[in-house]
């Protein structure tokens, strides 16, 4: 026999759906690159309108509504289905059918019965208004208004599917509140997200029904009564008198937890891409070896998150001016640094990849949740029955948020390890300790305070990585004996996102400081080389009588010393006898003198006799030349341009330095690190970092470089 549409024929002749368990749908949702998905999310976030139909809502659309600048439109095609379920409830009530939450009590007391359906809904809202707000201007116990907007949107989307027994007019009223930026005040705490987010959602119902304790906030932050909110939103006809089942329809859902989870995941996905790009910039400024991104390594590991993370880093590093310079340095002196970079650099794709897979999977889980019907009972008009189940159990939220938070903690841990290497002159391949940018390291401690702050952020973030969902308490007379704690987990993940933004901000400013230090290093090294060469030619080439002197052969080895020595190890006092430059330049001259043989005994051909003159001339000239080179770099007209301009990571650097106006930090300036961090953190929180971040990857074709 043949099967129609999406069915398949089994061996026994029966027909079944191709994907009856939705595993195929879940797998298909993860096709394509994570970066492409982030780009899609950003594009959706920026659209001016969200049309709700019940089944196509996305995380980015929820985040956009939460941000407050987007309008909502209800699909007119949903009206008939919503009305049908509402009518069914009323007809069922009139026939005397016994239905949970319509004629019965609630939860563990559902053995009670009543025929006063409207009064029952009113009592439901009253007893669920159990939240605590505090008094005065204290907002610490109020759910953020952005999260409330997200919850309102998700709840409308669920109710639009026509299984909930609620009037379309109520959904239109909530939509008007959203579009006029009028937000009910919901308590921050008090829900276990099973049976849904009962307590917070009851305050949306309280506003709709005009409860005297209901409060709202207007477009400019003004406090509104229910009557003022209705008038300002243009909701006509007065407060709603809830019909049977309508109160339950409003409160019996997971919208608060999944709404906040959507907001969290929108930011988390972007921060994950930022972590990939910053890891590549870290490799650039640390003079890392790019082979850690080689596709064969990651192909043999098979994990898609790792393969993509490596490919993104490979793209940033491919053709990087820093990588080219580092390769020359490694060839010149292969023993100057370890054969392999440390784990925070070399294994960053292996570390970030699984976190990205978790974040992506969680995003899809939440997208399924915000398009789910979470009521109990469900009204199945087609079969003329109410189905009692447990879709209000928000386990997908609790689990996905716990997993996401652990992934965020892992990203933060990597960031801290990378930052710790960056500021430590034992590990950072020639950058100054603390990334100090001034002339006198004894009066410039650079990012030392920032490193302490990063340790604090990382510790708190690791604590937040602990799960919420293993702290379930049996509730409501042991009826709700297992519950998801979805909103609690979402809230903790929102905290984790804020901390990761603090860490990302600090690290990003540190990377820009390192870029500028590499630029200064290159200019100063060129100046030192030119000066040493100039002095060598002047002092070492000729003897006292104008004859060629044996010391003329020392110049090449002297310049090799300059090439090999880390500039910031001596540049604050370049001619100090206790610093490595003068010591090693003298060592070169001594070694040449020892090889000079018998001619060394002759004062006119002695290289030893030239050492004092060479050092005196260098001391007279080098400090002035170094200061002049610094001044030229600071004036913005350096002899050697900043390599970052030749790199794919430049858009991010340009944004931080030019558009946000952050400065190169030194102890010579009044500006503190925290002032610059604030500029970046504010921009990051506004989403302004997205475009320069994506610009770094604009030319990536979505695949690793071919294995040559």
From Swiss-Prot:
Task: Please give the InterPro entries that the UniProt record associates with this protein.
Answer: Aromatic_Lyase, Fumarase/histidase_N, L-Aspartase-like, Phe/His_NH3-lyase_AS, Phe_NH3-lyase, Phe_NH3-lyase_shielding_dom_sf
Protein residues bound to (E)-cinnamate:
252, 340, 346, 376, 448, 476, 479
The places in or outside the cell where this protein is found are: Cytoplasm
Active site residues per record: 100 (proton donor/acceptor)
Annotated GO MF terms: phenylalanine ammonia-lyase activity
EC number per UniProt: 4.3.1.24
- Give GO BP annotations, semicolon-separated: cinnamic acid biosynthetic process; L-phenylalanine catabolic process
The entry's function note states: This is a key enzyme of plant metabolism catalyzing the first reaction in the biosynthesis from L-phenylalanine of a wide variety of natural products based on the phenylpropane skeleton.
Instruction: Tell me which family the UniProt entry assigns to this protein.
Output: Belongs to the PAL/histidase family.
In terms of PANTHER family, this protein maps to: HISTIDINE AMMONIA-LYASE (PTHR10362)
Assembly mode = Homotetramer.
Protein name in UniProt: Phenylalanine ammonia-lyase 1
Q: Which organism is it from?
A: Daucus carota
